[in-house]
Curated annotation (Swiss-Prot):
Highly expressed along the intestine with expression also detected in the pharynx, especially at the terminal bulb, and in the excretory gland cells. GO terms for cellular component: cytoplasmic vesicle; endosome; Golgi apparatus; lysosome; plasma membrane. The lineage of its organism: Eukaryota, Metazoa, Ecdysozoa, Nematoda, Chromadorea. It catalyses: cholesterol(in) = cholesterol(out). One of its GO terms (biological process) is cholesterol import. It comes from Caenorhabditis elegans. A motif (Cholesterol-binding sequence motif) lies at residues 124-129, 570-578. GO terms for molecular function: cholesterol binding; double-stranded RNA binding; RNA transmembrane transporter activity. The keyword Repressor does not apply. Residues 19-268, 395-421, 495-498, 552-554, 634-637, 693-728 are extracellular. This is Cholesterol uptake protein 1. Residues 1-18 form the signal peptide.
Amino acid sequence: MRTSQAIFILIFLDSVRNQSPQVIPAKWDVVYEKETGHNMSLTVFRFQVKEQYSVARIIMSCNESTEHNPLLAVFREKLAILSLQVPLIVDNYEYSQVARTLCPFTEYKEGEAFTVEVTSSRPVHYNFRAELVQNFYLYNNSQRLVTASASEPVYLRYDIPGDVDSVAVHLDSNSTICMTVSVQKIGCPVFDLPDNVNSMGLHQTMTTSATIPVEKSRMSSFYVVFVVNTNDDLCSEILSIKPNKPTKFPLRMKSFNVTIESSMKIFDYTIPIVFWACILLLVTIVVFVYHYFDGIWERRFVSRAYTHLEDNAQEQRIRDFYDFQRMSEDDDLKDYDLLTDCQDMMVVRAKASLTVADLSMTPYEERELKYDVYKIALAIIGIFYNITVLQLIISKAGSLRQSGDLDECTFNFQCARPLWYFVAFNNVVSNGGYVYFGTLIIVMNYCRERSFRRLFAVQPTLAERYGLPQHSGLMTAIGLAVIMEGISSATYHVCPNNINYQFDTALMYVIGMLGKLKIWSLRHPDMVVSAYHAFGFLGVFLMAAIAGVYVHNMIFWALFSIIYIASMLLVSLEFYFKGIWTLNLRELRNSIRLSWVSSRHLSCVVPAYKARFFVILLLNIANTAVVVYGLEAHPKDFLSFLLIPFIGNLFIYIIYYILMKMIYREKIPKRAIALLFAAVISWTCAGILFNQRVSDWSKMPAISRELNKPCIFLNFYDNHDLWHLSSAFAIFFSFTAINVIDDDLMFVMRNTIRVF
């Protein structure tokens, strides 16, 4: 627009070349009230440049000029020709007062003239004033109050000191008027109009807060440009009604404070990173020391347990011998009708009181293969998933660096620590905890598996009749999922927005699903869900979750509610009846009729498994409440909305499992109690930090930046970074506790361990 406007003006000037212009020796800071001449005659204002590198600002106003008879002004400088038109019309918003800051007089010598040429097609009255900009330079940690309007953009200059690697340009305002802030390399012309301010450098929209991190390697000196937008469409989800034709509007003024602060040097990044690495190293030392002493305890324990098991086996053989002899003497086996299907699944699971032995009748090797499929399938999914994610995010990072449009990503810009291609390197590196603890879960699970194999080699009876069946596949899959969560979360934080939000959220769903399956498998080893069915269901679930991000009509919510409640009902039936129910309506009707006829005092209404019924009722009430809330509120952040019940159900299941152990008077190992206590503390801290949001991709970028907050730890980590760290600890403590919570049952007969 600027180039075409200048060409248009030059054509006008060429048409009046033969006319004698009116030349006015002008003075700075003087208001000239003039009228343009007839026949496109020129009025030339000549200003003496008193000082090199000084900066001029022109203010013009005219109430008589129109779209078809504009007041035109051309500023002739040595490096460029700039133009100005009154009224200024942008998207049919018309402003009769216009101001522009010109390029610094870098090539002028003292006494040379700077000219402003004014003309119009018909005579109009106008006011004109030229002034030298005072305090054109910005300085470190010095706050500057600036005022700009839609037709009066402002820009200031800043030079990064030699001992500074990067700076943060911070703005705050009490006004919510939408404005665009741009950081541009030193040059002429400066792009300071609403239609071209986004064409150069780094830029972002602003309501009450904005922060732009600038690296010295990218721009050692730059202009900070402030352009107030004609409306709030770029900052608000509610679009304004634009005029159909040019309409005069009053000036949209916005006052704000500008502060430039030095960011951390690259060398200073090592302190918070090394600090975090030392914490992880300390955890590693504690884990290995624990395993060392645990190995000593294991050898002593196995020695005592071996004698105990031999004594029990001898006593059992004696009891079996006398029982068989007594039966032989009293009756003949031929007198009894033998139940040939006593080992049938339907018969066993219909018992009033199930034991783990009833649900672990499948050969160990066959079960182990099913559990191993989880880690194999997840590893394959992870490879293809993360390759695609990495490819997309690398492309996105390059696009962000080229376009400079910081509205593409919802960072916490007040605590963004740039490095290499990362705008907020701290958000990326803080995800290392997931990768570390996921790896640690796998290593500890492998050591545990080896320990059990050594134990079972010494005493094979343990693997067949005692304790809970030990399968490592699911826990290894959980470790892989946590590693993938760290990688996906790191890639998401390269440029967080609504397009790639599902990168790490999808892995949170995987962790939640595997956690529930792990707890279920502890006492239901034969009822393992096929990995293909589990991941297939999760895939459909994720498709619905992604659809919910973009579709918000009532039809979608109605379908979602029906499917969600139906899924909860099916899971509830499976949990309550342990897989021996059917959807055959005739059998269901006959069963209800038989129960009603055979019951006394409505005893058929009383659930046979009260504890199961209670937890199912609690879960269904909680999940129904979530669905009702969704129908009422239609939350835009649908992925997080679904994640809450998904993880909440896991927590309720863990609490239920612990309470049932206490009800059946099963001891909880001290280490499991310690781990659970640490998990509760970690989850509490994580929950508090998560709710203290520092950005929100579901909101407009300018609105999201209103949530931005400074770093709160080591001048490097913000609330969300600490959420990453604390939730990584919480996940590790939680799943490690689940893995050892039943170690007290290692030498308890399997046919005496209750299923719940």
